[in-house]
Amino acid sequence: MGPSERPSIGWTPKEAEMQIGPQPDGWSRGWKPGDRGAVPLPLSPALSFLLLFPLASALQPTPLPFPELRLVGGPSRCRGRLEVMHSGSWGSVCDDDWDVVDANVVCRQLGCGLALPVPRPLAFGQGRGPIFLDNVECRGQEASLSECGSRGWGVHNCFHYEDVAVLCDEFLHTQPPTRKVLTSMAPATALQNGKGEGSVRLVGGASPCQGRVEILHGGVWGTVCDDDWGLQDAAVVCRQLGCGVALAATTNAFFGYGTGHILLDNVHCEGGEPRLAACQSLGWGVHNCGHHEDAGVLCAVLSPPTSTALPPSVTKEDWARHTGPAATGVGASPSRDTVWLTTAARASGKKSGRLRLVGGPSPCRGRVEVLYAGGWGTVCDDDWDFADARVACREAGCGPALGATGLGHFGYGRGPVLLDNVGCTGTEARLSDCFHLGWGQHNCGHHEDAGALCAGPEELGLQVQQAGSETTRMPSPRPRDGHLRLASGTHRCEGRVELFLGQRWGTVCDDAWDLRAAIVLCRQLGCGQALAAPGEAHFGPGRGPILLDNVKCRGDESTLLLCSHIRWDVHNCDHSEDASVLCQPL
């Protein structure tokens, strides 16, 4: 494991940096309800080594009573803003270092099943009163949050707009066996591309093209460790399985813990390899991981293509352009000469006003919502596939489809779930013309909201204009907290990074800014691959507040706000240090 990787015991680099030096009130590495004195816990070899130094005395566990926690402000007891009780009062938890591993512990403690992806900031509002915990760090196996590390009661550097929110799948333990469950471990439902050496399969996902990555070696199936796991690696897996482009590379056993051997670690794909086994790694069976680090993928196509699944008007050439190595979407390498050209003229469509895409980086990428009886509602991802996305994109006036998403990829909707088991041929004018169970008939929750990735009018216009037609640019949506934009560049995919927060636009300081942050931002904005991450106001100094500093990304985060950073508005910069990115335009 190289210097840039996180220690396998579960600490993040940020946490390790914080521990070398004086600690506020002592670093808590676990506590038990009812304890009053310091009770040392078993220490790993790495932590024992640190105890040889004088400063390490600050790392001794400080037992803290932790009788209760709750989720408030959400639609159910299993979804909301996290609060813990201390000394008779309820308080918030700060989101520094918070991830799905920590959320899984909370969900398990509450009897709420599996944690879903970490929601956007302020998803359930801001808390009031004290902030009790910060830098919570769980390994994933803990029975309760009280066994995880933290900085200690009341020690933090946060504000309430950093309050942790948690989404659990409360249906996990009550669903019938036939209903899809995120943690399904049955290999019988897994998609795999063969039984030969180097074959891969996805296990534990809600559809055949999502799940924990397992690979076959020496006749034995094993998992892949998430050290260095990223979107290029996921792209190879999705392509090997015929599942289109990669939407996300998941870490920290997002799709549940595997069993048996860990066969690959530090996988590094260039993105063009035909098989995962062709990528660089430490070698078969060489790793320093546990199954809490099992890698996974989410691919754009929910089900793999078959020779009989293509609608009459879709040629194999069209399908290959959307699912082959050159297909362009989130995280794929762009290829202008193969994407959209053959379908642009007949796929642009006219907006019906009865379907919209929301929650995404542009008006043509997002959660699918349909209008019925005067109200908007969502579509469940049961049977949702590329043909359905084609119709949704056409009805939205957004050109050809690039991919179909599920599992609430673009956030969780509100209100009714209006359609389920949608089955389109791909030629319908409206989504409501496709087969479905009937308006309002479903067995879903909003964690199953379907989405679509469309080429969009901007990109479509490049192709349509070549054919002698005209196109109209869609107006930009009104910004909301957390929205990002690139300013002063020559096109929409390069420029100075600006963030919208509290009804104002502000900039990002270039301290610690690097290509990994650019990768996250380019992906979030629906642009191509990150080319550079210049600092020093490369595109000129901005105005207004400097909202973020010391942004540190791994590169696989879904949004820039999930990267580690100093708390809002705290920095030591001026606008001569504004951060920028250059992304390859699509």
Swiss-Prot record:
The keyword Secreted applies. Residues 69-169, 200-300, 355-455, 484-584 form the SRCR domain. It holds the Pfam family SRCR. The keyword Secreted applies. It is found in: Secreted. InterPro entries: SRCR, SRCR-like_dom_sf. Disulfide bonds join C94-C158, C107-C168, C138-C148, C225-C289, C238-C299, C269-C279, C380-C444, C393-C454, C424-C434, C509-C573, C522-C583, C553-C563. It comes from the Eukaryota. Residues 1-33 are annotated as: Disordered. GO terms for cellular component: extracellular region; membrane. Residues 1-58 form the signal peptide. Keywords: Disulfide bond, Repeat, Secreted, Signal. Its main location: secreted. PANTHER family: SCAVENGER RECEPTOR CYSTEINE-RICH TYPE 1 PROTEIN M130-LIKE (PTHR48071:SF27), SRCR DOMAIN-CONTAINING PROTEIN (PTHR48071). This is Scavenger receptor cysteine-rich domain-containing group B protein. The gene is Ssc4d.
